[in-house]
Amino acid sequence: MEPIDFTDCERLPGRAYNGANGKKIAVRYDDDVWLLKFPPSTAEKPTTLSYSNSCYSEHLASTIANMIGLKAQETRLGTFTNGKTKVVCACRDFTADGKVLYDFCSIKNTVIDSDTGGTGTELNDVLETIELQSFVDPVELKAHFWDMFVVDAFLGNFDRHNGNWGFLVDPTTRKAKIAPAFDFGSCLLPQADDDIMRRVIGDKAELDARIYNFPASALKQEGKKIGYVDFIAQNRDGVLAPSLARIVPRIDLAQINAFIDDTPYLADHQRRFYKVYLAARFSALFASGE
């Protein structure tokens, strides 16, 4: 995959984007609108608590999600120079054609029969909102929700909240469809620095801790974050069965490893880390059900 220099691309100052981690600007590249995500500043932050790898996580996880059957944003890695040259993740703006993005938090607030606000991530409340909302077919939306959960489990996403998935609405026809999944920067242990990566590669206890202990889902049951491994083990023959049947057969670790090898800017130990981590997550989450 050829690296891209976005420095001289036309800036589009009329577009702005939400999100807490890192600066974001819009540029025109190859006749499309792209959102450039910059790595967060590490000033006055311990390395292990920064998200210095979030741009890599965003690109790798978004692309892998598409590879294994979840419709997700299209991303590219490149550089942008403004005094310093930084690696950035470019995300194709899927609202550039005029459609309006409504996140699930906004939709949740329209369900007047719900007793909780839009930001609540209690699983039963989220599922109730899926049934009661009137934007898209609830059956289709529930299938997408569980597909996204399975993919997030594989990728180790600890921040799939109600503000980073949702719907695209055509302002003229008022018709809605499910938006591509986006905001994958909290996948694949973005806080891991070089030392942690090497420890995870070389120490099974360090690796297992980052599979069985954390990260957990942002979804909750009775106020407690859902652990991915236990939840999938308990529900593989229940609510998760259709999504597991759709997603898991499409997870080709050899194909994913080839993609990682073809990704620019990564050091050899980073490539090794992502391969080891994904293989271990696959085994812990899915192999026992084969």
Task: Place the predicted regions along the sequence by residue.
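ATP-dependent phospho-/nucleotidyl transfer catalytic cores
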Residues: 93-149, 258-263, 284
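C-terminal catalytic region of ATP-dependent kinase domains
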Residues: 66, 170-290
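Conserved ATP-binding subdomain of kinase catalytic cores across diverse folds
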Residues: 1-113
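Aromatic-acidic/polar surface patches that form glycan- and anion
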Residues: 16, 53-55, 143-144, 267, ...
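Short alpha-helical "patches" and their helix-cap loops
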Residues: 75-83, 161-171, 290
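A broad, structural surface signal
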Residues: 59-67, 143-151, 276, 280-283
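Conserved kinase catalytic-core segment
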Residues: 124-193
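A short, terminal or domain-edge coil/loop segment
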Residues: 2, 8-12, 124-138, 193-196, ...
